[in-house]
């Protein structure tokens, strides 16, 4: 989540010993926010197509539900069925914190017999949000080069690199992608709205 192109370029030296890397470019779906762009990855659909097939998603968006990405596994299963891949065995795992990542690493061999392992990793997105809120992170990530270095240093010491090394040893093909990136704001703008307006910073709806 939130991994930019320059972040990926920064971590390539850590991945090159493990994999033959093929780099392909894509654009994020608009609006570049997780409820839309990541759901598009798992469903293979544009937002208007999604709300037609999944009406509950439309109602969740209108009600500003706390999580608009809770059905990612179901979306992915449906997309596999669309491509007549019903027999593909799947393990889906969303990781928010280091403890969860360590638990996944310790159990990764249990999932090795699955045809498809899907990981959602939120560290880079959390770093993007928290680096503007916490003074200690403002010191550690003062600019774009610091941001890239922080992402590389995290991966180098993380459970995820250990998991990728295991995948490499097992001969797995790995696809690493991102739902959106981030931009460091230099000139912020105050948006006036009533209390029914959405609270997100990437896009707004309401009055």
Language-model features: locations:
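Feature captures the catalytic ectodomains and active-site-proximal regions of enzymes
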Residues: 2-207
């Amino acid at each position: 989540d939130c991994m930019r192109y320059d972040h990926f370029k920064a971590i390539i030296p850590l991945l090159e010993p493990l994999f033959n890397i093929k780099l392909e470019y894509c654009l994020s779906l608009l609006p570049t926010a997780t409820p839309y762009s990541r759901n598009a990855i798992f469903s293979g659909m544009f937002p208007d197509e999604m709300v037609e097939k999944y009406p509950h998603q439309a109602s969740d968006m209108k009600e500003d539900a706390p999580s608009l990405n809770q059905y990612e596994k179901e979306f992915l299963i449906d997309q596999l069925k669309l491509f007549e891949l019903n027999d593909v065995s799947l393990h889906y795992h969303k990781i928010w914190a280091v403890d969860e990542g360590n638990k996944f690493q310790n159990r990764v061999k249990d999932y090795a017999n699955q045809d498809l392992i899907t990981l959602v990793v939120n560290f880079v997105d959390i770093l993007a949000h928290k680096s503007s809120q916490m003074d200690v992170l403002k010191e550690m990530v003062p600019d774009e080069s610091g941001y890239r270095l922080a992402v590389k240093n995290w991966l180098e010491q993380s459970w995820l690199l250990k998991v990728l090394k295991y995948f490499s040893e097992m001969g797995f093909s790995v696809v690493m992608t991102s739902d959106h990136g981030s931009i460091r704001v230099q000139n912020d703008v105050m948006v006036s709205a009533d209390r029914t307006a959405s609270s997100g910073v990437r896009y707004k709806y309401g009055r």
